[in-house]
Amino acid sequence: MSKAAAPQIELASADPSIAQEMTRWLSHLGAERRLSPKTLEAYGRDLRQCLDFLCNHWGERVTLKRFAALEATDVRAFMAMRRADDIAGRSLMRALAGLRSFGRFLEREGKGKVGALSAIRAPKVAKSLPKPLPMASAKRLADADERAGEERETWILARDAAVMALLYGSGLRISEALGLKRREVPKPGEGDVLVVTGKGNKTRMVPVLQNVLALVQEYVSMCPYPLPAEGPIFVGARGGPLSPRIIQLAMERLRGALGLPDSATPHALRHSFATHLLSRGGDLRAIQELLGHSSLSTTQIYTGIDSERLLEVYASAHPRR
């Protein structure tokens, strides 16, 4: 059976030929590059905003020929406009990356070469270290008893505890935890590995602790909705897919009760997983595999957090000590 064609994009600021190529470009990124729907949505939004800007900047609808003749000053003006809107540096980097990708796609398709895009330097982004939680705090966030006083149904409290236990216990992204199907999560004593689908639909195997599986099983036994094997294991209050925002709100309530900083987010549990493994002597390459990072340089950011431990190792092991 052939795949359904992607819906045609309509643009008020650009010629239909641009809209057609934009549709083909996003379809290509989804099918060939396996970019996530959220990334495709962001790339599409960035290109729309650029085309809207150029239409206003030039005083005419953007055509393929005009876009191919784009000048560096046009791109810089667009980036300056976005920066004036207080857009973060990382978002500006993504916008420029998307525009360059679209330009390369047009060139490969013989629609023209947008040379100006390669002449623009990517905006500088200050690197900030992840903010892991202390080990005791991370454990409390994954403890169902900490939620006992909340005025919510007990099965929902058990669900939230199970999700956070997976984030900290296996280093999952929140999208990965909520994307797990019931058949993919073993019962306690029947397995100790999860097969997780991460960014770019790449799968990886991660170990899971038996006490974490016990929390998941406790939630499953309390859940009032049927949880078919091929359906998501975590569901919302009405039995539908569980939104990441619900877990974020649960974290906000709990960090207030526990006196934790605003940096205590669901993703901070993943950071804590990596940092605590490293502090206990975990191998950086093994942690890279567990996190699903394609590049070791991404994982190496955690060495900055744990520099104190590395200095201790140096002091105790250096041959000239």
UniProtKB/Swiss-Prot annotation:
SUPFAM superfamilies: DNA breaking-rejoining enzymes (SSF56349), lambda integrase-like, N-terminal domain (SSF47823). The keyword Cell division applies. Site-specific tyrosine recombinase, which acts by catalyzing the cutting and rejoining of the recombining DNA molecules. The XerC-XerD complex is essential to convert dimers of the bacterial chromosome into monomers to permit their segregation at cell division. It also contributes to the segregational stability of plasmids. One of its GO terms (molecular function) is DNA binding. This is Tyrosine recombinase XerC. It is found in: Cytoplasm. It comes from Bradyrhizobium diazoefficiens (strain JCM 10833 / BCRC 13528 / IAM 13628 / NBRC 14792 / USDA 110). Residues 128-315 form the Tyr recombinase domain. Residues 16-107 form the Core-binding (CB) domain. Forms a cyclic heterotetrameric complex composed of two molecules of XerC and two molecules of XerD. GO terms for cellular component: cytoplasm; Holliday junction resolvase complex. GO terms for biological process: cell division; chromosome segregation; DNA recombination; DNA transposition; resolution of DNA recombination intermediates. Keywords: Cell cycle, Cell division, Chromosome partition, Cytoplasm, DNA integration, DNA recombination, DNA-binding. InterPro entries: CB (IPR044068), DNA_brk_join_enz (IPR011010), Integrase-like_cat_sf (IPR013762), Integrase_catalytic (IPR002104), Integrase_recombinase_N (IPR010998), Integrase_SAM-like_N (IPR004107), Tyrosine_recombinase_XerC/XerD (IPR023009), Tyrosine_recombinase_XerCD (IPR050090). Belongs to the 'phage' integrase family. XerC subfamily. The active site is at residues 173, 199, 267, 270, 293, 302. The keyword DNA-binding applies.
